[in-house]
């Protein structure tokens, strides 16, 4: 199977300071679990779904990514910018249908298939079974969680804010999304407008998260569709994540 018309952009510029010493000599995405790196695990899932048109946007120790044989674009300002800025370092690649994925996550084939099945212009995977996973990573799940509210029609009405209670979290944002060409035009307009007007994202574009972009899209009445999944993914942010039995159990996707 070949998904030739779908490009995948991997945001792999991260330094992974909270994963030191494991990231002293490599990008965050190249940290290994059970003998295989996060990025290798992700590429394996993508390849099995026929997703071979991959672009990596690197930063920290960017040259190490060359071993994978894919196109690399460098965010030379990785140390002072955030996810959204990293994505737009590859603005020339934002055409047609594009999957955008963080580099510090791994997901199962069922997760990527659910995303591929969505016909929405902006589709975002969310973990409905997030709470038990978050409790295994944090004493208080609200410490590292963000709001995510979903309308009856399945579109997201709010994302990325600080929650006051668990009731404001109807799923966990995973860092995996898909845009149609129309959806890409919508986010490009938001991004370029935000450079001139800091109020659009609530912060300057250089320091904005992807969730800031998605929230701005929602505010401007663009449909952002939730793609619900139930577990079958991991995120590795800290040494504790890397070493936990939960991570090692869930990595058997």
Please state what every model-predicted region is.
Residues 1-10, 18, 32, 36-100, ...:
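Conserved N-terminal catalytic core of the sugar/cofactor nucleotidyltransferase
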Residues 2-8, 159-160, 166-253:
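Conserved alpha/beta core of the MobA/IspD/sugar-nucleotide pyrophosphorylase nucleotidyltransferase superfamily
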Residues 24-28:
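Short alpha-helical oligomerization interface
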Residues 30, 148-150, 226:
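A structural signal for short hydrophobic beta-strand segments in well-ordered beta-sheet cores
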Residues 68, 109-190:
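Conserved core of the sugar-phosphate nucleotidyltransferase
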Residues 29, 53, 71, 155, ...:
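Conserved beta-strand segments of alpha/beta enzyme cores
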Residues 103-105:
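The conserved acidic donor/metal-binding loop of glycosyltransferases
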Residues 18, 64-65, 110, 186, ...:
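Phosphate- and divalent-cation-binding pockets in alpha/beta enzyme and binding domains
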């Amino acid at each position: 199977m070949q998904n030739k018309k779908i490009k995948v952009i991997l945001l792999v510029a991260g330094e992974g300071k909270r994963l030191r010493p494991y990231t002293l000599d490599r990008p965050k995405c190249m940290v290994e679990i059970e003998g295989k790196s996060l990025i290798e695990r992700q590429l394996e899932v993508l390849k099995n779904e026929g997703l071979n048109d991959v672009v990596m946007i690197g930063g920290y120790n960017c040259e190490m990514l060359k071993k994978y044989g894919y196109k690399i674009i460098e965010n030379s300002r990785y140390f002072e910018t955030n996810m959204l800025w990293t994505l737009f370092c590859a603005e020339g690649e934002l055409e047609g249908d594009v999957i955008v994925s963080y580099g510090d996550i791994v997901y199962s084939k069922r997760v990527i298939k659910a995303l591929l099945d969505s016909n929405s212009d902006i589709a975002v995977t969310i973990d409905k079974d997030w709470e038990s996973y978050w409790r295994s990573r944090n004493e208080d799940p609200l410490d590292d969680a963000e709001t995510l509210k979903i309308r009856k029609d399945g579109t997201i009405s709010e994302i990325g804010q600080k929650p006051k209670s668990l009731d404001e979290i109807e799923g966990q944002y995973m860092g995996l999304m898909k845009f149609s060409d129309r959806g890409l035009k919508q986010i490009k307009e938001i991004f370029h407008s935000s450079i001139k007007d800091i109020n659009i994202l609530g912060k300057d574009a250089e320091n904005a998260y992807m969730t800031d972009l998605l929230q701005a899209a929602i505010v401007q009445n663009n449909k952002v569709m939730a793609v619900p999944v139930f577990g079958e993914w991991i995120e590795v942010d800290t040494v504790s994540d890397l070493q936990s039995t939960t991570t090692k159990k869930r990595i058997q996707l």
